[in-house]
Amino acid sequence: MANTKFRPLHDRVVVRRVESENKTAGGIIIPDTAQEKPQEGEVIAVGNGVLNDNGQRVSLEVKEGDRILFGKWSGTEVKINGEELLIMKESDIMGILA
């Protein structure tokens, strides 16, 4: 994403999904058509925050490089420079993985 000229606005973040395993614990390979999309990702770009009631900018808690969990239906899928990414609001993020 470093060579991309895209920067999300306000409280939005750009997320790259983390690929899930395509094999079960028993060794059965799951085809792409039967796999669920992962709900884990890496934040690759963040907006500059939102304005509070006093007009002060409140920055986001997540930052580039954070590994996050998000809801199954969170975000909007977009393609930027040929890469499938998600754009979502920070409130759609459930937590940061340590």
From Swiss-Prot:
Disulfide bonds: none
Compartment(s): Cytoplasm
Keyword Iron-sulfur attached: no
Main location: cytoplasm
InterPro entries xrefs: Chaperonin_GroES, Chaperonin_GroES_sf, Chaprnonin_Cpn10_CS, GroES-like_sf
Gene3D superfamilies: GroES chaperonin
GO CC field: cytoplasm
Origin superkingdom: Bacteria
Keyword check for Cytoplasm: yes
Assigned keywords, A-Z: Chaperone, Cytoplasm
GO terms under biological process: chaperone cofactor-dependent protein refolding
GO molecular function, one term: protein folding chaperone
Known role: Together with the chaperonin GroEL, plays an essential role in assisting protein folding. The GroEL-GroES system forms a nano-cage that allows encapsulation of the non-native substrate proteins and provides a physical environment optimized to promote and accelerate protein folding. GroES binds to the apical surface of the GroEL ring, thereby capping the opening of the GroEL channel.
Family classification: Belongs to the GroES chaperonin family.
Subunit structure: Heptamer of 7 subunits arranged in a ring. Interacts with the chaperonin GroEL.
NCBIfam families per UniProt: PRK00364.1-2 (NF001527), PRK00364.1-5 (NF001529), PRK00364.2-2 (NF001531), PRK00364.2-4 (NF001533), PRK00364.2-5 (NF001534)
Name this polypeptide is given: Co-chaperonin GroES
Species in which this protein is naturally found: Bartonella bacilliformis (strain ATCC 35685 / KC583 / Herrer 020/F12,63)
Lineage: Bacteria, Pseudomonadati, Pseudomonadota, Alphaproteobacteria, Hyphomicrobiales
